[in-house]
Amino acid sequence: MLTEKQIKFYKENGYLLVENALPSKILKGLQDVTDEFVEASRNVAENDETYDLSDDHSKENPRLRRLKQPHLLHKTYEDVTLDECILGPVSQLLGNNLRRDHTK
């Protein structure tokens, strides 16, 4: 959980960096799933409903700029948005009335 000093910093500056906010197991899961999407993007030549590709993307050198709505593409992304390691600090800063509209 956040300290009073962190909450004060957020209120004064509008942002907060929380070191090691994600447990290593969750971070590793996100990295593995993202690597799978990067690998799959080798077979995609242009932006589509899933992939936003970099201009220099190629089959030989896949360059994935972002996944569109990742929480709908894989349960790992969905799960992290609902995990207490994210929701706990966010609710401390913004309150409990939270809603996810979309993701990038």
Model region roles, listed by residue range:
Residues 1-12, 19-104:
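Non-heme Fe(II)-dependent double-stranded beta-helix
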